Curated annotation (Swiss-Prot):
Organism in which the protein naturally occurs: Pseudomonas paraeruginosa (strain DSM 24068 / PA7)
Start and end residues of each Core-binding (CB) domain: 1-85
Gene3D superfamilies given in the database record: 1.10.150.130, Intergrase catalytic core
PROSITE patterns recorded: CB, TYR_RECOMBINASE
Domain of life of the organism encoding this protein: Bacteria
Biological classification of the source: Bacteria, Pseudomonadati, Pseudomonadota, Gammaproteobacteria, Pseudomonadales
Gene: xerC
UniProt protein name: Tyrosine recombinase XerC
């Protein structure tokens, strides 16, 4: 059974050319399914039935696994079984028709515009680390990059003269994004210092030794900046969420925000409309004459 799993992972890597992050996710989820099958005494994938898989998913949910994680596990299982069916290694898909337990969708955490400016407008020392960190923070917020997109960014994809950056997002899709003035200036201040560090390759963001920054290193730098400037923990995706929320709030153009974020489905982008409504409701509560009378004991029972 492990041989079939390894063959599928190699198929994903070499033929479908999925990212290392995606491949790790598939492997992690499918190893859980393999452990389930072995614990049940199964000797081939055809013996795993829908009832056993449903019970396993329910148990994981009771143990605290999120609906999102379980949906990903079922998706990986379906992909694996579709591969087995094509290869003639199996006659059915036990995950077909199964869905993860639903849970309320959490709204993404964002910074309000004033807090974003507070994070980015502080004094920046003219040294390697400070200039690099300022550039990556500005680019996250200016262009709404994912962490993987920023870490994977190479110089050849950056056009500061035109104020554009190209990134390779999910599904290997390339999109072109604008780079705002503040981010351009931060990058222009950073790149000469980068060149002095003898970079190993074309990575835009590197450490002192010239190596490309890892996702973990960027997460730590963003977190430290949040604590230092705002007194709160901050993660890269919060800057991406803030970019999307502030842009939608100002423009109202959901399709444009979808394109900039690289979402394949506009339903994914629509979560930011809920954030925008929260902002509008807050403004209403503060500014509308009738709203301000709520809870006012002197309001009486006006006709």
């Amino acid at each position: 059974m492990r041989a079939d799993l390894d063959a599928f992972l190699e198929h994903l890597r070499s033929e479908r050319q999925v990212s290392a992050h995606t491949l790790d996710g598939y492997q992690r989820d499918l190893l859980k399914i393999l452990a389930l099958a072995e614990k049940a005494g199964l000797t081939d994938w055809n013996a795993l039935d829908t009832r056993t898989l449903r019970t396993f998913v329910a148990r994981l949910h009771q143990q605290g696994q999120s609906s999102r994680s379980l949906a990903r596990l079922l998706s990986a299982t379906r992909g694996f079984y579709q591969y087995l069916l094509r290869e003639g290694r199996c006659r059915h898909d036990p995950a077909n028709g199964l869905s993860a337990p639903k849970s309320p969708r959490k709204l993404p955490r964002t910074l309000d515009a004033d807090r974003a400016l507070q994070l980015l407008d502080g004094a920046v020392e003219d040294d390697f680390i400070a200039r690099r960190d300022q550039a990556l923070l500005e680019l996250f917020y200016s262009s709404g990059l994912r962490l993987s997109e920023l870490v994977g960014l190479d110089l050849e994809w950056l056009d500061l003269k035109e104020g554009l950056v190209r990134v390779r997002g999910k599904g290997n899709k390339v999109r072109e994004l604008p780079v705002g003035k503040a981010a351009r200036q931060a990058l222009e201040a950073w790149l000469p210092l980068r060149a002095q560090a003898t970079p190993e390759d074309g990575a835009v963001f590197i450490g002192r030794g010239g190596k490309r920054l890892t996702p973990r290193a960027v997460q730590l730098r963003v977190r430290q900046a949040g604590v230092r400037e705002l007194g709160q923990h901050l993660h890269p995706h919060m800057l991406r969420h803030s970019f999307a929320s502030h842009l939608l709030e100002s423009s109202g153009d959901l399709r444009a925000v979808q394109e900039l974020l690289g979402h394949a489905d506009i339903a994914t982008t629509q979560i930011y409309t809920h954030l925008d409504f929260q902002h509008l409701a807050s403004v209403y509560d503060r500014a509308h004459p009738r709203a301000k009378r709520k809870g006012n004991a002197d309001g009486g029972n006006d006709p």
